[in-house]
């Protein structure tokens, strides 16, 4: 997909970064995670779900390969240099957190929540907490647990897969 993903990424900054900008450098992931996730959305839209999943997997691997990434919070209130927050956590992990969120709430609620966040915060500074409020308003669910675990915490999901083969079928 090459250059197309770069274009999708930069175009998404018209909304996440320009229409609503980060409240501070610690909140830059709100801009960059959406721009990163737009690459998956574009691949899925233009080439189909398999290509979107492939883009998502590639970005996940970029996060997992980064030394020390698992110990960094997505939203980092303390950093030595603002450039420190432009990394695989803010971009790649952030995009994967959005993908998990989309799967949790469903496409309809996910995209309505994004619209709500952008509408409520247009021409202002936003932060992860504003995004949570938009999701809560649309879904009617308390999303504090999700934000506390994924936006304000470090680490990544540990997945255990068990197979049971019966008659040659998994």
Language-model segments: what does each one mean?
Residues 1-170:
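Hydrophobic alpha-helical and helix-loop surface patches within well-folded domains
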């Amino acid at each position: 997909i090459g250059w197309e993903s770069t274009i999708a990424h930069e175009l998404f900054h018209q909304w996440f970064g320009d229409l609503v900008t980060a409240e501070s450098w610690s909140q830059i992931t709100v801009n960059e995670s959406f721009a990163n996730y737009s690459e998956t959305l574009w691949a899925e839209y233009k080439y189909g779900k398999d290509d979107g999943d492939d883009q998502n997997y590639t970005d996940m691997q970029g996060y997992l390969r980064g030394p020390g990434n698992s110990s960094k919070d997505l939203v980092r209130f303390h950093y030595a240099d603002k450039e420190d927050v432009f990394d695989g956590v803010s971009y790649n992990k952030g995009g994967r957190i959005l993908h998990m969120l989309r799967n949790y709430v469903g496409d309809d609620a996910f995209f309505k929540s994004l619209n709500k966040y952008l509408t409520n915060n247009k021409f202002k500074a936003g932060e992860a907490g504003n995004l949570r409020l938009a999701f809560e308003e649309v879904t009617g669910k308390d999303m504090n647990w999700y934000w506390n675990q994924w936006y304000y915490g470090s680490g990544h999901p540990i997945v255990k897969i068990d197979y049971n083969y019966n008659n040659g079928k998994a």
